[in-house]
Amino acid sequence: MSGLSPEQRRKSIGEIMFYMRNYSVPSLIMIFFAFAFIGWVWEVCLHLVMDGEFVNRGVLAGPWLPIYGCGALLALTLLKTLREKPWLEFLASIFMSGIVEYGTSLYLEWTHDGQRWWDYTGYFLNINGRICAEGLLVFGLGCMGIVYFIGPVLDSIFRRVKLKILTPICVVLIVLFSVDMIHSHDYPNTGKGITDYAVTGEEAPGGISQGMP
């Protein structure tokens, strides 16, 4: 922004941070993969710090946790009407995150012979070990950061990329992700630090990092 007047600089920042924007399909696709990757990095780092070892978190083989990407897209699109009311946005984000996480837990158990990739048993206000108050609070706060800051910034960045460049990137990512989904349906990612959580009243290893697939 060098060379811009203070007024032009404020206007440019305002455009970047405008959270009532409409997101294009290519931007939404890129945002999905961005947050799927960020979620994977988040959980890997938590496990690395708390347990001292690298673990490829999640059901899939690749460096992405799609539930984070889905949560980001739902927050940016379904909750737009609440954008001017942050407290309602926050509460709705918590409710939405609970539905997504609980539903994902049921789906994974149903499609993988009862196998669980996380268990919140023993956490405060947990429901069947699938969701808990602590996790939902974290995800609700995360959604607020996404809709009011990170999402608009990422969208502003992606809008600067020409469609003839952005479109092939989206296609390649979708193809790789689809292949991973198909492969992981029959050969899911399991093992130490992934599915070896506590199933009684004890906390899962890695704490809240066990909360997302």
Task: Go through the PLM ranges and name each one.
Residues M1-P213:
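Aromatic-rich, lipid-facing transmembrane alpha helices and their immediate juxtamembrane interface loops
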